[in-house]
Amino acid sequence: MSQLFNNSRSDTLFLGGEKISGDDIRNQNVLATMAVANVVKSSLGPVGLDKMLVDDIGDFTVTNDGATILSLLDVQHPAGKILVELAQQQDREIGDGTTSVVIIASELLKRANELVKNKIHPTTIITGFRVALREAIRFINEVLSTSVDTLGKETLINIAKTSMSSKIIGADSDFFSNMVVDALLAVKTQNSKGEIKYPVKAVNVLKAHGKSATESLLVPGYALNCTVASQAMPKRIAGGNVKIACLDLNLQKARMAMGVQINIDDPEQLEQIRKREAGIVLERVKKIIDAGAQVVLTTKGIDDLCLKEFVEAKIMGVRRCKKEDLRRIARATGATLVSSMSNLEGEETFESSYLGLCDEVVQAKFSDDECILIKGTSKHSSSSIILRGANDYSLDEMERSLHDSLSVVKRTLESGNVVPGGGCVEAALNIYLDNFATTVGSREQLAIAEFAAALLIIPKTLAVNAAKDSSELVAKLRSYHAASQMAKPEDVKRRSYRNYGLDLIRGKIVDEIHAGVLEPTISKVKSLKSALEACVAILRIDTMITVDPEPPKEDPHDH
């Protein structure tokens, strides 16, 4: 402790710990965020590269999804962790744009730090950034955004394609984008407030080895990765109004709990106990059969004793289903997921109102795997995608890519507006905010100009990843947008330049709306808002105090 008071630095606190403040901590934070952003930078865009992440036991993941990469990293620095959480939040809320949100946040921080070094107070910078963000969002909504109604189903397919372009299924995006749009349109529902929703979770994705990616299937109905419990059971039950019971309980012989002791003096009593053990579960099965169930799905086991009853009653029984699957099936068919058959009086009952309805339940075969399909569910419609691929790693990555595309199409359908992709929004905002900055008379002008410059990191990174000359392409792109914003209202051709962005395959500037490179407006707005919030949170930090861990206490009995 004595060395603490002898420490020459006057700003050391009177606690066992280390204090870093001023420029040191800002530089540290910027370096940490740049390090995190540089990991994902090269995976941005249609020609972005993948990352292989190996964990401590040797399992590896190959992916190009920003949120997945950052979740698997073990980030030590607190500022870096803020960016990881930022990517995860973007993934949860929008599903796509995780990489770009991290890159924008780190670039904003880097430029803000330069301004601080030039003696501009962080509060002034934050105010300037907030003004810039407000103007940017207004410009996106008023000028760049287009309503989907005017563009039709083709737009949704293009949005799904744009989301897939950077992923493993990018080469087959024509095939998969149609599949994604059809799957989502099939699960359209209306909630209690009368709003139309497209729940991504209602689209079940199953993975089966073998064949190629383009032999994946879209199946109407809910696909369960299970098979019937006995070969003697019917493999198909149809005819409309098929009654389904969803159970979260064990249909196995009841065994006495561990540690229960029963003293008996007559061997016949032992036989009675055995019979009663079997009787308890048989009574349950009878009640389920009497309620009229034709299909029984359970998360636990069904033993041979019960299977015999089900087979005789021509009931299809499926055991060891995932609870999450049963929850969704219960929601789609209107069934109740029963976890206990006891009622309030303590007696066991099974009401027919617990059953759900559908049109058909069938066991279908896909390559070597079999699965149960539940078609024509009564409450909400559902659809399933069965992915085919060479190995686990490619199937996992395909599933992540599909999830991103489904989320993006869902957001577009619910919000109804799209903007051109390919760096178009960022270039347009760059020109607009640069001009806007000159109209602001205070010191915030510098912050707004830096905000504008930071946005160019997206088109620059896209061009660099595509092995193109970024300086030339971005300069050309800016000249198009400058022309569009200075054009007179009657000059339609020059006004249409506002939709121009990068075509990274051919290295040209093209009209993105005609090229079909589109993104939901909400994705762009949300990523700018989130990136700014993360940047502000880190920029406001001017001191970091690391408290030393307490030394382990000595054990008095340790000689």
Swiss-Prot record:
PROSITE patterns, alphabetized: TCP1_1, TCP1_2, TCP1_3
Taxonomy, superkingdom: Eukaryota
InterPro entries to which the protein is assigned, alphabetical: Chap_CCT_alpha, Chaperone_TCP-1, Chaperonin_TCP-1_CS, Cpn60/GroEL/TCP-1, GroEL-like_apical_dom_sf, GROEL-like_equatorial_sf, TCP-1-like_intermed_sf, TCP-1_chaperonin
Molecular function GO terms recorded: ATP binding; ATP hydrolysis activity; ATP-dependent protein folding chaperone; unfolded protein binding
Gene Ontology biological process terms in this record: chaperone mediated protein folding independent of cofactor; protein folding
One Gene Ontology cellular component: plasma membrane
UniProt keyword Acetylation, yes or no: yes
Keywords noted in UniProt: Acetylation, ATP-binding, Chaperone, Cytoplasm, Nucleotide-binding
Positions carrying N-acetylserine: S2
Keyword hit for Membrane: no
Subcellular location: Cytoplasm
NCBIfam families: chap_CCT_alpha, thermosome_alpha, thermosome_beta
Assigned protein family: Belongs to the TCP-1 chaperonin family.
Subunit structure: Heterooligomeric complex of about 850 to 900 kDa that forms two stacked rings, 12 to 16 nm in diameter.
Function summary: Molecular chaperone; assists the folding of proteins upon ATP hydrolysis. Known to play a role, in vitro, in the folding of actin and tubulin. In yeast may play a role in mitotic spindle formation.
Protein name: T-complex protein 1 subunit alpha
Species of provenance: Saccharomyces cerevisiae (strain ATCC 204508 / S288c) (Baker's yeast)
